[in-house]
């Protein structure tokens, strides 16, 4: 009996941080025919249940674990005999032209059957104008942030063989490693500190917090490590090959990837560029370890006594909230007339009022004229009406925005356009002007948001796999995870006024919300903008606790073309913050009973 007939070992794939987990269910039986990805057993951690799938279609010969067994990565759980042909291994290719990565497994997506491209003869790919490659993939994804790994995983699910190029040691990009995720962990800690202090007004007093920066950093890093480990597992499960190193294009179908061992040339048929962005650094600012960007701020190397945040946008204000809660005296300086440019001023006001009570100072309409590093401190000089005298700070955080990485990829050799700001212009299918090269995320223009990147990544992957898809989202929500949070989506009031767009508006103040009063956070409000004729939702904004979670209802309403009555007539649970969205809609319709609004005329 051959190995395929006797059964091939099936082992537990990598599970991230979960090294010792119990088996809670056996989902297959000996003699059962299973399809690829059918669940064989279910494991349970303290946070989630995990199904271990069949890696290929076949007949179960043995089940080698039972309910209650504690197992981990690599544990032998079953043996499965192949039905039909075993997976095909490509024939070796002459080393002068490289090796070819391929997989001929077929998969089904709805009614569309996608076949992974067969092994490609290197001689057919390498032309006179193309250098030889060391490895070839039908699809290469350049960058493993939210847009990149989403594109890679979706493409693999659709049957493509994917190479994922990433320069960092871990997957997840800026968002997961040094952005969205670690910052939200620290913002949660900051909120707990502030809420504990506020409870003294209600008869519950705590002592001053004892802050152990080393343990706080370790907790933040554990969260990041769990998620990056999860991405590694997902890549392995999907057979996405990760190629690590600094990368640059060398031709229309080749990318050179350099690491400590040298340079490899990766060939591809199609490529999705998801190379992200980097922080902008102000000209004239000295190179000093006390002058940091958002990545440095998240490292929590120290708890400075006094810190200046240059930039009053989302990143600067979020990090200001963290350091203020940890005991640092924070000053924010913003060149624009107000904080958080792009957001309606009325939404920013409750946040600014709270921040002014916690921060040392907030300066708007003020320019940083000079930054000098001295042995004692960082001295900063300001310009503008009402500018303070030169000040000395222990830390200076540069948070003046980010720039796309499109200009650092050498992608011009492919014929792809790079605009003056470093963006790669794309169409609604996320294609650049070179049809086999796509771009998603920060390099593709538009708001630099992880949730936009993931949607674009899916579109690009599906188009690359031959599906008819386009990025057709009507709106993309924005969230500042400050305290209070600020979130908005769709048409803003400022945009409507500037563009002369007619609109109707209704707002519900949280001071009239039982839920917001119960949690002692009455400073917020919810507002909605409507088409004055059809009453359809055009946009909305929320400031207050968990605004980032609440804005999704407004986003869905806009996507579905809902009007005020659709929202108002939807029963919302009481008492909740989510019902403030319904109350705002009712206010526009004139049916609200939780406030008295005199009738006009």
Model-derived regions, located:
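Flexible, glycine-rich terminal cap/loop adjacent to redox cofactors
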Residues: 142-144, 151, 156-168, 174, ...
């Amino acid at each position: 009996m051959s190995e395929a007939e006797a059964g091939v070992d099936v082992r537990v794939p990598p599970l991230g941080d979960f090294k010792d987990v119990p088996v809670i269910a056996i989902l297959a039986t000996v003699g059962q025919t299973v399809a690829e990805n059918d669940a064989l057993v279910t494991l349970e951690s303290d946070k989630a249940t995990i199904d271990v799938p069949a890696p290929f279609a076949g007949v179960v010969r043995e089940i080698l674990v039972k309910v209650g067994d504690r197992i981990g990565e690599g544990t032998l759980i079953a043996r499965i005999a192949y039905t039909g042909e075993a997976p095909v291994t490509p024939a070796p290719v002459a080393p002068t032209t490289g090796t070819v990565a391929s997989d001929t497994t077929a998969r089904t997506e709805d009614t569309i059957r996608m076949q992974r491209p067969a092994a490609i003869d290197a001689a057919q790919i390498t032309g006179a104008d193309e250098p030889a490659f060391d490895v070839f993939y039908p699809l290469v994804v350049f960058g493993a942030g939210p847009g990149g790994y989403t594109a890679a995983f979706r493409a693999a699910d659709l049957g493509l063989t994917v190479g994922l190029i990433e320069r960092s040691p871990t997957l997840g990009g800026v968002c997961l490693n040094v952005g969205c995720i670690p910052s939200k962990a620290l913002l949660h800690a900051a909120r707990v500190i502030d809420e504990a202090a506020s409870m003294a007004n209600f008869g519950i007093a705590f002592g001053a917090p004892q802050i152990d920066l080393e343990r706080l950093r370790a907790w933040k890093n554990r969260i990041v490590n769990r998620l990056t480990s999860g991405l590694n597992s997902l890549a392995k499960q999907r057979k996405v090959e990760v190629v690590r190193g600094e990368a640059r294009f060398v031709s229309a179908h080749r990318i050179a990837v350099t690491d400590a061992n040298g340079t490899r040339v990766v060939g591809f048929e199609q490529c999705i560029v998801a190379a992200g962005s980097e922080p902008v650094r102000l000209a004239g600012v000295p190179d000093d370890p006390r002058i940091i960007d958002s990545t440095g701020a998240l490292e929590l190397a120290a708890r400075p006594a006094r810190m200046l945040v240059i930039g009053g946008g989302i990143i600067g204000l979020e990090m200001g909230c963290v350091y203020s809660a940890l005991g640092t005296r924070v000053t924010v300086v913003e060149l624009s007339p107000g904080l958080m440019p792009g957001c309606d001023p009325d939404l920013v006001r409750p946040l600014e009022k709270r921040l002014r009570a916690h921060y040392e100072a907030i300066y708007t309409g003020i320019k940083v004229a000079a930054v000098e590093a001295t042995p004692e401190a960082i001295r900063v000089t300001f310009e503008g009406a009402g500018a303070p005298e030169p000040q000395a700070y222990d830390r200076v955080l540069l948070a003046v925005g980010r720039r796309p990485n499109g200009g650092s990829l050498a992608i011009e050799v492919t014929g792809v356009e790079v605009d003056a700001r470093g963006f790669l212009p794309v169409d609604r299918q996320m294609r650049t002007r070179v049809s086999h090269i796509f771009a998603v995320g920060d390099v593709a223009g538009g708001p630099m948001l992880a949730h936009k990147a993931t949607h674009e990544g899916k579109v690009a992957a599906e188009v690359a796999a031959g599906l008819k898809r386009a990025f057709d989202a009507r709106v993309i929500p924005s969230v500042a995870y400050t305290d209070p949070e600020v979130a908005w989506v769709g048409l803003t009031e400022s945009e409507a006024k500037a563009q002369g767009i007619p609109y109707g508006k209704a707002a519900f103040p949280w001071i009239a919300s039982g839920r917001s009063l119960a949690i002692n956070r009455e400073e917020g409000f919810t507002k909605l903008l409507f088409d004055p004729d059809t009453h359809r939702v055009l946009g909305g904004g929320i400031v207050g606790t968990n605004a980032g979670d609440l804005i999704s209802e407004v986003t869905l309403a806009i996507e579905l073309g809902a009007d005020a009555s659709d929202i108002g007539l939807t029963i919302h649970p009481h008492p909740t913050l989510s019902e403030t969205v319904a109350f705002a809609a009712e206010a526009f319709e004139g049916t609200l009973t939780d406030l008295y609004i005199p009738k006009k005329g």
